[in-house]
Structures are given as C-alpha cells and as structure tokens.
Regions:
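Class I S-adenosyl-L-methionine
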Residues: 21, 65, 69-76
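General small-molecule cofactor/ligand-binding pocket signal
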Residues: 34-36, 83-87, 138
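Structural beta-alpha unit
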Residues: 73-107
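A short acidic, glycine-rich active-site loop
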Residues: 53-66
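Small/aliphatic-rich secondary-structure junction motif
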Residues: 1-51
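Gly/Ser-rich helix-loop-strand patches that form or flank binding pockets
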Residues: 98-141
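Phosphate- and divalent-cation-binding pockets in alpha/beta enzyme and binding domains
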Residues: 15, 94, 116
Length: 141
C-alpha cells in the first residue's frame, strides 16, 4: 500500500506521520510511504529581477529539505520504505495530483499545518485535499 503523508514541518504533520508509522510498522503489510513537502511559489515578478531561477529552485529545495528533516529522521528509524519529494505550487492541488501520479491508495495528513488564521477551523488545506481527491484521506488530530 502506498500512503502519501504531506509534511510541512509542523507538529501536526509529524504527528500524522508517527501515526502512520506506528499503525503500519511491523504489521507485515507491504507499505511504501511518500513524504511530500509543497513550497508555495514566489509569485512576484519583481523578485525574479534580482534572483535567477536556479537560485529560486535552490531556495525551494533548501526550505523543503528543512521542513522534511525531522520526518526523514522518523522514517530512517522506522525501517519502512519511503520516498520524499519537494513540490512547488498551490498546496492542496499539488498534494492531490502527486498522490494520483504516484499511485497512492491513501493520504494521511494533519488537520492543521503551519498556516495562520485560515487554518483556525479544520485546516483549509486538509479541506481542499478532501474535495480534490477520490482517495481516502485520514486526518490526524
């Protein structure tokens, strides 16, 4: 079973990952986890006057790796097979399309991420993912 766990570096996203690992680790079930960090694109055209696309890609990679650092450590200690990826784009659609592209059978995610007031109620990203995918979505509080 392939499970996608979106990781933004927040405690809620790490809690979702720990839940999946504890639930599936040692179960004997063939499982493959996909960790996905999505970086919001820097939309301002003015920014591109001062930095190159390569510098921007390096920034996305560095920020993504920083957000995935603890999740990768959890996975390294779990013994479960995993892949990680850093995407750039609108967060919820990127999560939904990545899950489809990789053939995931489930998405497990925290109810709230690093967002601010927009996430005060059931996280707006989680809500959008639910509406954008036909896959089962497990929300971990």
């Amino acid at each position: 079973m392939k499970i996608l766990v979106p990781i933004d570096g927040s405690e809620n996203s790490l809690r979702a990952l720990r839940h999946v690992v504890s639930h599936h680790g040692g179960s004997g079930e063939a499982i493959e986890l996909h960790l996905l960090n999505v970086q919001a694109p820097i939309a301002s055209g003015a920014v591109k006057m001062f930095i190159t696309q390569t510098q921007l890609n390096d920034y996305y990679r560095d920020e993504g790796l920083a957000a995935l650092k603890e999740a990768r450590a959890i996975m390294d200690g779990s013994g479960l097979p995993f892949h990680y990826h850093i995407g750039v784009g609108e967060i919820a659609p990127t999560i939904a399309s990545y899950a489809k592209e990789k053939g995931c059978q489930q998405i497990a995610m925290g109810t709230h991420g690093r967002g601010g007031l927009a996430h005060a109620f059931l996280g707006s990203v989680a809500t959008r993912v639910i509406h954008l995918t036909d896959l089962p979505v497990s929300l971990i509080k």
